[in-house]
Every structure is written in C-alpha cells, then in structure tokens.
Amino acid sequence: MAKTSSENKVVRTVARTRKPARAVAKQPAVRRRRSSGDTPYHHGDLHEALLKAAERVLERDGLAGLTLRAVAREAGVSHAAPTHHFGDLTGLLSELAAIGFRMFNEAMNAAGSSETLPVMKALASAKAYVAYAQAHPGMYGVMFRSARLDYSRPSLHEASDAAFAGLTRGVAASRQEQISQQSLSLDQAAAIARAWSLVHGFTMLLLDGRLSDILSRLPKGTSADQLLDAMLRTMAPRPPGL
C-alpha cells in the first residue's frame, strides 16, 4: 500500500506540471503577411475595379499591352478574376468600349448644349468629338476596333447606338431639319456619312501625326482646331454675324 501511495503522489505532481491542452489552442495564429497585390475588393466592386484598371493599362501601355493578366496585375487580383467577369479579352474590350462611347456621347452632348444656334451646336459637337479622341487616344482606338468587339453585348450596343444618335442630332441641327434615326432618306444618310467621315478621318490623321505637314504650311500659329473649324464651316451655312 505504501508503494501505491507514493506512485499516486508522483502522478498528481506530473499532472499539475502539465499545461492544459486548451492553452495551446488559445495562442494567436500566425497570420500570412498580405502582399501589395492582394488588394481586397468587396463582391460588388470588383467588376468596376477591373474596368478602371483596364483603362489605366490602356492609356499607359496601349492596346498591345492590354491583356487579361496585365489588368489582373494592375487591379491586384488573381489572374482568373478578369476571365470570371468578362469571359475573354473581347469581352473586356467590349465593356471598355461601352464606357468610352458613353463618355464620348456625354462630351458631345455637353458641347452642343452650350450653344443656342443649331449650326453652332453641330460645330461644337464635332469639335468635342475630336477633343475626346485627343484626350483619350487609347480608349478611342478601342471604340473603333470593330473586329475586337462584341456588339451583341447590351452595354456596348446601347452605348454605341446612343453615340450614333448624337451624331445624327448634330447633322440634323446643321441641316435644320428633323432626322429619324430608324428611317433615313438617302440624302440624310449621305449627310451623316459625310460628316462622320470628315470628323473621324480628321481625328485619325491628327492622332497619327499626319496633319503636321499641312499645319506647317499654314500661317504661323494656325492650330489643328482652327483647321477643323474651317473644314466644318464648309459643310454648314455660316450664321449671320459669325
């Protein structure tokens, strides 16, 4: 019995010296350090964040540098995130172009609304067309890369259609007549195509630096904007006193 009592004391002493198992569980877990690329986004924000990242990549690196992986890196998210939201690069470019067309249309409408005379509204809208392209050359390039876009996407279809409606209104103002976008006469269609060809062609030549030679032959100080103004005025009657 004495031996048993001694053994019991040893067992009790060992038990008192052991740390409870739950004490280990209470130790704080070591957290992984967040890298700069692990930017957290709320569920509803990631789509917009990816589009903004795509805009930055486009303006900085051009269309050639705009890839799904580049956008993911810029946004600080996984490489799979852009694919999940847009499907492929065509999907991303299409959503980006939709944003461009909306901004483009807003700029033309704002410029036109600042004028009172119909002809001046048309001239102001045309100048806003060129100014937008100069301010956002990368976005403008995407908007008119039809082969890279999916016009079956509602956002792009609606935005581009609204921009065309704005162009139609500008031509209608210069002609001082009502034009139905759904039903055009041949003469009206020709007027729209002529105006669009002039402004878009001028814009592309300007962005590519192809107008430098012409501008160098004009009186010193003549700007591209003045050249555009002279071109536009040949297409519309000049209001009295202007």
Where do the model's predicted regions map?
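Alpha-helical DNA-contacting segments of helix-turn-helix folds
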Residues: 58, 93-100, 143, 159
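Amphipathic alpha-helical segments used for helix-helix packing
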Residues: 134-152, 204-212
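Hydrophobic alpha-helical connector segments
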Residues: 95, 109-139, 160-161, 185-195
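Amphipathic C-terminal alpha-helical segment
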Residues: 173, 195-214, 231-241
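Solvent-exposed, amphipathic alpha-helical segments
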Residues: 53-61, 103-114, 198-205
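N-terminal intrinsically disordered/low-complexity leader segments
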Residues: 1-45, 56, 239-242
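Amphipathic alpha-helical packing segments from all-alpha helical-bundle domains
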Residues: 108, 151-179, 189-193, 221-236
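Helix-turn-helix
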Residues: 49, 53, 57-91, 95
